[in-house]
Amino acid sequence: QMCIRDRVIRGKEKLCGAEHSVMPDRIAAVTYMCCAAVTGGELILSGADIGHIGAVVPVFKEMGCRVYSFGKDSIYIKAPERLKAPHTIRTMPYPYFPTDAQAPLMAVCTVADGTAVFVENIFDNRYRHVSELLRMGAKIKTEGRVAVVQGVRRLSAAELVSPDLRGGAALVIAALCAEGTSTIGGISHIDRGYEAIEKSLYSVGADIRRI
């Protein structure tokens, strides 16, 4: 059962200056963790707070990944050679599983052993990336808010078009583990949420470039 918390704000006539550190992007952190997971890799993410993704970490662990806080503001993840599909992922408002992590995790589940079920409880029409993943050989069936993903051994490269921000990130994740060379159009969607994602991935060994 979801807990609803009220916030009451009482204004003042005068405000004073203050210093505040902007929190790191938790969805970007999850996306790069997905990249490590889908490639069987090992990664340390700096400037990331594991406390912000508390609902997602158990999913990675269920898939067989080792995940823990590394230092003051870093996250360590090491993926197994073959991932296990998580049973059910239900999107909910914070602090539960975020809807923006649904598409990236679905891309990972396309090559995991077993079947994963996604239930999208936040937005309608949130499975626009599925048609592109199917073109890569993924096995996904959708009905309403539910998507059932049956893992395959390997995806195949394809010419793809990013449908939206997180869907585009999902295609990048899928392309990293696909056999062959994929191209992804519509990257302006991806640029809205990630700063030079190709440079970040290239820096850790991915064969990726912007054309």
Task: Tell what function each PLM region has.
Residues 1, 5-211:
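Short, structured segments at the rim of ligand-binding sites
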